[in-house]
Amino acid sequence: PLGDAVHRRMMRDFRLYMLVGGMPKAVAEYIKTNNLGAVDLVKRDIVSLYEEDFWKLDNTGRATALYDAIPAQLSKNASRYQIASAIPGERAERVAGIVKMMNNFMSANVAYHSNDPNVGLALTMDNERFKIYASDTGMFVTLAFKDKDFTDNIIYEKLLNDKLSANLGYVYENVIAQMLR
């Protein structure tokens, strides 16, 4: 047993990691400025670059819509990513290639359902039932609070200090998915 003080410090450091993430530019900005607002701006620039790349690879905008909807999808606590709620009228089989591309480019982590996890995943993987996670937990936090100008420092501070009243299970789910990749 490490004691409560050490546990609190380790959890705070872990939450700081969840906020900053592991993108080299975001980490460098935090080390340089110790300012979560500056880090958020760096991560927003990275999100914009991802979205530009998605448009180059898929000019329909579906990849961008799928990526931007990751936080909303995870917060629903559903067993799979619901394509039609991210892109009205769309179906999983029609975006399978886009989802695979996002996974291969490591901009997102895709966890496919398996019909029988006791045998090789490739044999039982269900390409139409999956969850999509952000590849970086810091990017996920920026996506989740993207609707606000500089993800109000209040949100960052509350999340860092474990004082945010929202259920953050989906943030932890994303960070665990990142760790398992």
Predicted segments, located by residue:
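Accessory nucleic acid-recognition modules appended to NTPase machines
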Residues: 16, 23, 27-181
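Amphipathic alpha-helical segments of the small helical/lid subdomains adjacent to P-loop NTPase cores
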Residues: 1-22
